[in-house]
Every structure is written in structure tokens, then in C-alpha cells.
Swiss-Prot record:
Taxonomic path: Eukaryota, Metazoa, Chordata, Craniata, Vertebrata
Membrane topology: Multi-pass membrane protein
Full protein name: Electrogenic sodium bicarbonate cotransporter 1
Gene Ontology MF terms in the entry: monoatomic anion transmembrane transporter activity; sodium:bicarbonate symporter activity; solute:inorganic anion antiporter activity
Stretches of the chain found on the membrane's Cytoplasmic side: 1-466, 521, 572-585, 711-725, 808-819, 856-877, 919-960, 987-1079
Amino acid sequence: MEDEAVLDRGASFLKHVCDEEEVEGHHTIYIGVHVPKSYRRRRRHKRKTGHREKKEKERISENYSDKSDVENADESSSSILKPLISPAAERIRFILGEEDDSPAPPQLFTELDELLAVDGQEMEWKETARWIKFEEKVEQGGERWSKPHVATLSLHSLFELRTCMEKGSIMLDREASSLPQLVEMIVDHQIETGLLKPDLKDKVTYTLLRKHRHQTKKSNLRSLADIGKTVSSASRMFTNPDNGSPAMTHRNLTSSSLNDISDKPEKDQLKNKFMKKLPRDAEASNVLVGEVDFLDSPFIAFVRLQQAVMLGALTEVPVPTRFLFILLGPKGKAKSYHEIGRAIATLMSDEVFHDIAYKAKDRQDLIAGIDEFLDEVIVLPPGEWDPAIRIEPPKSLPSSDKRKNMYSGGENVQMNGDTPPDGGHGGGGHADCEELQRTGRFCGGLIKDIKRKAPFFASDFYDALNIQALSAILFIYLATVTNAITFGGLLGDATDNMQGVLESFLGTAVSGAIFCLFAGQPLTILSSTGPVLVFERLLFNFSKDHNFDYLEFRLWIGLWSAFLCLILVATDASFLVQYFTRFTEEGFSSLISFIFIYDAFKKMIKLADYYPINSNFKVGYNTQFSCVCMPPDPVNISVSNDTTLAPEDLPTISSSNMYHNATFDWAFLTTKECLKYGGKLVGNNCGFVPDITLMSFILFLGTYTSSMALKKFKTSPYFPTTARKLISDFAIILPILIFCVIDALVGVDTPKLIVPSEFKPTSPNRGWFVAPFGGNPWWVYLAAAIPALLVTILIFMDQQITAVIVNRKEHKLKKGAGYHLDLFWVAILMVVCSFMALPWYVAATVISIAHIDSLKMETETSAPGEQPKFLGVREQRVTGTLVFILTGLSVFMAPILKFIPMPVLYGVFLYMGVASLNGVQFMDRLKLLLMPLKHQPDFIYLRHVPLRRVHLFTFLQVLCLALLWILKSTVAAIIFPVMILALVAVRKGMDYLFSQHDLSFLDDVIPEKDKKKKEDEKKKKKKKGSVDSDNDDSDCPYSEKVPSIKIPMDIMEQQPFLSDSKPSDRERSPTFLERHTSC
């Protein structure tokens, strides 16, 4: 039974019954078993139910997803509602469900050519529309392509197309090497089947081989001799009854119209820039429709070639043709033919019918594909919509995977937006990933991480050979340098320069480069963090108060903390990461983002305070404002007597001033020189420098807004796609360079980046190596384990939460994560930094997210009107490694870096903080608080969770975030990592406040809870006794013995049951269509 195909018992509703030869080679399909949760067409017979029946329905719906049909059940159970599947859907499931190892069908380019008169004389095939995803029409008067738009079809044209496919010639998997050979094959087949009279063969062949005029070809100039030859040949063929024998006619045909036909593409085709929109393996589908005066009935053919073939100038672009649809009909129905051509072209651009067209084995398969399309089509009332209005392509296309899975036997399919994103949960979801499975062996997780990442080590270097990597290096380098200088300066203040800017540069370079070279996730960027800075300040003050050697005490804390981290690595403790749900991730990442935004504005306010603006200045009273440099005593000092001023330090004095002033006046000195030589500034305008603050804010806001605008420039309508992509990739570097140039041109003395120019420790009281013994009592070495425990929690939480955010499913990383390997290298680097008295480093959330954003990849070729699809992230080790190497070399680049204004870098900080909040569900829910109900976006969780529950969840998240912010700003900030760990406990407590249904859309379901839920369901099944003992212990879905209910989806009248005495609707439909078709 397992090796044979199961025949469809509902096949009596089909006109065509599959025989044994037809089903041979198909895999086994159990009709009614493993039915997905929902289909689009589901009819229910409603009636009033009693209390007992309601309970029964509730019990059935509770286990609905685990049940399946059994065919030999009693009819007493027929009231149980099951998904209804039409015969067309059954046939499509049979087609698409085949286990085929062949590659996926290629992208199709569909072109619609119509037979039209050129200059009112000669008939030619003229391109009028084309499709990849959306329709583009040739504008009648403008000689240009229209904007891509959604193809709107008349329902009547689809019915006409269906009848055409029923009556016309269907030729599948034919061999042809040229267009004349293909045309001759089609015409001969029509004659053999009695659809075409033999005496019309030459006329049809001549018509099908007419020249093709494409939109790219602006003119089709030919000599008068050629025109005359063509016209005379046509007149002889169509008007002279004694045209000779068929052989002579064929020779005339060949000489007159086939000489210009070539199998090779023309120059215009090769130069067509539209090829950039198509993938390399694309194939063509040509649709030829037109009206002629020598046919009494339509000439219809649908051809699929065994191998795609280049057919010369048949197609606008030089791609091989796989499909050909021909419709020639009598005069007077040109519009109808045009609409049928648009219908088949639109069907070929539909992803489901596209696959069916490639896999169809006969006519009935193609008709079933049309029926499926009709089942899914949406009809608009004629009085409420103007078909002439072109519908803009949507920003995000609905995935066709659900439709395909529904027919290919996919499970757990939910239609109409019922499925939560990312694997059924509301968030990124990482509970089931292989990297977080506990092995139970010593260093088992670490070994698996190494084995997982080792095969990709070589590709991690050559995958970086792209211009995008250069942009990412420059962007992250500037962010890292700014971060190193900022934290280095704060560490110097907190530790009395025992750790300063130079130590920050060196530590960042060494730790970051080693981590990016050997860690499990090289996209993660290491940096100093706020909690580490707080700990360093408290530790220094504690050592100073108790007369401990600070660096030695810090060394032992680092060693103990590294030892504890290695224990966590050896015991696979990283599996606890699966309890970091979206609630914890978003709380942590949002807090860090807000810190970046807050610090950027805080530094600008501090700058404005240092260079204040004179708010009392008035233009009309500018004579009352002055600032004069006065000497230290009231006696003026003669220039000749002043021997302390160097010649280059003297102010510039004009000859007239020298003439009138025999002695030198201190008023000519600059502010800096006045203070340098002991003078004092006197006046009510001293200290006010309005230009610096104003210019700094221009640079700050200009850098931020320009970066945001250029990052979105990729989707703008300006410039070609390549230029837009290049500008978007360098969206951060370009504003930095532009505003550095503006700052230099304006000449205002804004504060600049200060980089150490000498390679030596910041403090003369320390060296580059810390001795482990001799500075503190022996018991301090053991007591250091207590603060080390706190540092371990800090390192583990910071590192792993950032790793979870980096490895989210929505980033589509293909090379896997390495949580254990990452923590291992963080521990090793902590030992190195402790011995060298360098700052400790851990994963930086915001910079890591910025690193990923700068390396995102999108489809290079996208159909007109289609938004580029996100493919993933360029996973490699080169960008991070070079960033940290450049950071170490920054000491030698001080002469160049000193020209970068600090406000520009603060603008980069603001951009990173805001950009990392994009796409965070927490921010979307915050915006909902300010939106009226009618203006709220159509988020998936708003469809399934009451709004008050959404606001309650948001309120709890805001409350936790506020508490973390307050804690961070106080002396108790040292327990900050413990409070982040408390977020997991808060999220666990939400299970008692929210249902699992609500949490599955608003957050991730905690794995343990999910397992418990499944166990409870199994216990319920055992108690009810509805499952055999064999099924209780198996993993197979629970099934009830109920009959399959199969009602055709294309019926015109809904009936509860179908009897054999009445003809099926599929048999009646051709009669109905014959009265309403042009075919």
C-alpha cells in the first residue's frame, strides 16, 4: 500500500478519470489525512445546536489541528465540518505534491503581441504588454511603457480562456529548434485533429511568421523594394486561386517571409536594459493574439517546449522561449482576443499557475490550474470600481508559499493572515534552534559550534569581496572609534587615568580583531558598555578607600570571572538563552538604543553649555557689547621691552596702528594668547561664542537627517537602481564626508576629534603588564570571586542577549550561530585584557545591529513594480576584523582624524540609536497608544488580541524599561545585569496574566510552557478514550473516523449532497461557457 498511489475516491466529480498509467510514478497521497488547518473556501451548514452538541463541537475544535479524515466512516458523523476541497484542488495537490528532485521552475517573462496593421497597410505582430510580476502596457500615444500595475481582468475573459484551453490544441513537451519549425508543428497538429482546414495552412503559417515590432525598436525602416516584394507576395498568396501546388506555395512563403527569420537574438535585444530585471535563467512565455479575415472559427494552441529555445526576434529580450499561446480568430472580436491574451499572460505570472504550467501532464491539469486561479480570484462590483484605474503594486506581496503548501501537502497552513509571523510566534523565535540544544556532555555545545562553523571559515573571507563591505567597514570604524574615545575618556575620569583613551583603543583593537577572526558569530561587534564602566568606577573607589592595588585586584576579578564563564561554556549554560523571549530582547535593545539617543543629545547640550549663546545680544545695541584683554597690571607693556613673545605669537598689527601706538596694546591678543600670557578678559561679551553652538547643531542634525534620507534613497524614484543602491550602501559615510567639508569651508572652530598621538600608557604609574602577586593581601585573591560573580552575570547577559538579537530569524543567517564559542572567546579575551590592564569588552547591541544593517543583501534583479526581497546578511569575518585593525592604527592616523568634528560623530550616534529601533514591535505598540482605532495599521496581533490586552502588555514593558533606566542612573547600577535577568522572571509571571494565545502573538511562547501544554493535551485525549492505545504512545496526529466531505469549488448552486443521478457542475460548465465565449 505504501508503494502505490491512492486513487482519489472523489474523482467521479471530474470529467477525466486518472488511470493506472497516469498515476504511475506519483508519490502516495492520503486523501483526507493531514488536512491543513484552513482553506480559503470553507462552507458550513449552519443550524441550531443543543447544549450537548455544542460541547461536542468545542471538544472537536479543541483538537482540530491534530485530526484527519478516514474514508470508511459512518454517515452519522457527516455533520462534523471539515475543510472542503474541490476536484481541481485535489488534482493540483496531485501535481504540485510530486517528489521531484529537479530544480524549481525558472522565472518567466511573458510578452503579449497583437496582430496589428502598420501604417494602415501591412500586418505585423506588435508588442502591447509584458509581465514579470506586474503588467506593463505600451501607452498608445506616448510610445512608452506604463508604470507597472496590478493586472485587472474581467471574469468573462477568464471563463473564455478556460473554454479556449478546453477546445484548443494542447501540445506539451515538444521539440523545436526554430520558429518556422514550431509554427509548422502547431499548424500540422491542428490539421490532424480536424481543427483547421488544410487549405488554410499556408495563410496561418504566413500570419504567424510575420515580423515582430517591439517597443524598444523605435522604427522599422525598410526599403521600398522589400515592402513591394512583401505586398506582392501576400497578394499572390491570398487572392490568386491558381497559386500553384502546395510545394510551390511553400517555396514562395519561404522566400518572402522566412528569409529574415533568425534563431539568434538581434542587436536591439542584446542591448535591451530590461534584461537587468530578469534572472540569468529566465525563460519566455509568448502570447500571440489577433484577428484575421480568412478564419471562420478560432485557431487556438498552447505549446510547452521540452527545452527552452531562442526563437530570434520573437521576444523583446534575448531569453529562450518555453511557452507559446496562440489565438487567431475571425474579425470583429479584437477586444475579446486582447482580454484573453491578458488573462493567460497574467496566469503565467501567477506563481502557482506558473508551477502548474511547468508540471502539467495533460489538458486537465492546465484547466485545473485555471479553476484554482478562479477559486482565489477577487471580483469587484462593476459600479464601484473603474477598470481603467491602474492599481499600484503593493509594498509587500502576499507569499504564495501558503497556496503552494496547501496543495503540496504542507501542514499547519493558515490562510488569510491567521498565522503569526516567524514560525507561529509573535517574535523572532529561537526556542527550537539547534545551537541552543543542551547536549549533556562536557563542552558538547562548544564542540558542536566549532564543527558547525569550521566548514564556513574559508567562505567567511571571500564572501566579503563586495563594495558593500567597504561601506560597512568605514561606517562601523567611525562608530567604533567614537565609542572608544568616549568610553576611554570616561574610564580615565573614573580610574584616575589608570585606563584611558589609548588603553581603550588598544583593547578594542586586540579584543575585537581576535573575536571577529575566531568567534562563532563574527557579525557581533565588541565594545565597552555602560554597566562595565559603572563597575570600574565602583571598583576603583573601593580599592582606593581600602588601600588595595586597583589593577591587581581587577586582574583577579577578571580571572575569576573568566573561569566562571568557561564553566558556563563547558556545561552548555547558553541553552538558557531560549528563555530570552521578545519581551526581554526588546527591553534590553530598546534601553541601549535610548541610551545612545540620550547620550547624543546630552553631549550636544554640554557643548552648547561650554560655548554658550548670548541670549541678551541685540543688534541695535551692539556697541554696548565688548570683550577686551587686559594685562595683569594696569601698566601697558612696550613691545620692545617684552621678550617673552615669540615672533610667530605676535598678533598682526597694521602700520597705522604701529604709528599711533608706540607701545603694544594687549587688546590685540587673541583669547587663547591673552590667557596664555596671564592676561584677563574683561567685558560683557566674553565667553559667548554663538557661531560654534549653532554650527555644531547644524552638523549634528544634518548628519542624522542626511543619513536617514540616504539610507531610504534605495526606494526613491530617482536615478538608476545601481546608483540608488550604491548611495544607500554609503548612506553613513557620505554625510560624514559632506559635513566635514562644510565645516572646513565655513571655518568655525567647532570641537574636533582628539586621538592620542603617542603609543604609551595614559598614566606614568603603570606599565603594559600587571603582576598577579605582591600588591594585595592573599585573601583578596579569593575574595575577588564575589565581585567576579556579578561581572559574570553582566558579561553573560550582555553577550547572550546581543547574540540572540543578532541571530534572529528575520536576519536569515545561513551559517549558524555559536553562542558557546562566542562566550568562550569573551572569557579568553577577558584574561588577556586583565593582564594588560585594558578595559573588558562584551558584545555591543546597537553597533552590532548597525553592522548587520550595513551588510543586508537584497535581490539584484526585481520585477518592475516589485520591491527588492531581503535575502539575508553578508556573513563574513573581514569587515569586523578590518574595523578593529583600523581602530588600532588610529593612533598613527591622528593628523587625518583631527579634522572630523565631534557633532558629526554625535549625529552618527543618534542615527544608530534611532535606526536600531526600526522594526521593533515595542515601538509599534507605543505608537498605537497615540493612534485612533480607525488609523491603526493592520498588525497581525491586532487581529487576534484585544486592544486593551495589547496596551496592558506595552504598559508592563514600559514600566520595566523605566525601572531599568532609573537603576542605571543611580549608584545601584552595579546590579544592572541582575535586573536584566529579572526581566525573564517578569516575563514568566506574565503567563498568569495573559493567555498563551495572546502571548504567541505579542511575544514568544516559553519552551517549557509549550511542552507542558502538549502534555496536558495528551492527558485529555487519554481521559476521553478517543484514541487507541497504539496511538497514545505515537507521534502521529489524532484522527477521528469521519468521512471526507468533498464538494467541487466551481459549482454554481450549493447543495448539501451530490447524487450520481445529477450531472456534475464540471460537466455543465462547458455548456454554460459556450453561450458566453468568443472561442
